[in-house]
Amino acid sequence: MAKKIIGFIKLQIPAGKANPSPPVGPALGQRGLNIMEFCKAFNAQTQGMEPGLPVPVVITAFADKSFTFVMKTPPATVLIKKAAKVDKGSSKPHTDKVGSITRAQAEEIAKTKMPDLTAADLDAAVRTIAGSARSMGITVEGV
């Protein structure tokens, strides 16, 4: 028989830097989950990633105080800002441009994000990434 699910917890945690302090500790503590067990498992799974890169994670909490978690790909905005070498997007995205990325960079980001996107093929995923970049004030050359 399947375990009874008591809830889902969605967090964004920097890769390799999960610790019991907020937001991780309170979110897991109120469901009665073992915080250190999650932190060790999360840090072990993200040790191959770039340290500090925010990783969305969905934790499934069960009634017997056990849990499982699924890691998603880093947010597209973070990957776009890294590719464009900017700290933040434009406050007026359609008038002030803060940087640009090439189509090749957009394709690389789309390949990374493909498991989490609803796009049917790579070209549709590239257009999705290009739209996100435009809404941040970053131009995409060749799209």
UniProtKB/Swiss-Prot annotation:
PTM notes: One or more lysine residues are methylated.
Q: Name one GO molecular function term.
A: large ribosomal subunit rRNA binding
According to its UniProt record, what is one Pfam family this protein matches? Answer: Ribosomal_L11
- State the SUPFAM superfamilies in the record: Ribosomal L11/L12e N-terminal domain, Ribosomal protein L11, C-terminal domain
Q: Which PROSITE patterns match?
A: RIBOSOMAL_L11 (PS00359)
Q: Which GO terms describe its biological process?
A: translation
Sorted keywords for this record are: Methylation, Ribonucleoprotein, Ribosomal protein, RNA-binding, rRNA-binding
Q: Which GO terms describe its cellular component?
A: cytosolic large ribosomal subunit
How is the subunit organization of this protein annotated in UniProt?
A: Part of the ribosomal stalk of the 50S ribosomal subunit. Interacts with L10 and the large rRNA to form the base of the stalk. L10 forms an elongated spine to which L12 dimers bind in a sequential fashion forming a multimeric L10(L12)X complex.
List the PANTHER family hit by this protein, alphabetically.
60S RIBOSOMAL PROTEIN L12 (PTHR11661), LARGE RIBOSOMAL SUBUNIT PROTEIN UL11M (PTHR11661:SF1)
The record ties this protein, via HAMAP family, to: Ribosomal_uL11
Name assigned to this protein: Large ribosomal subunit protein uL11
What organism is this sequence from? Burkholderia cenocepacia (strain HI2424)
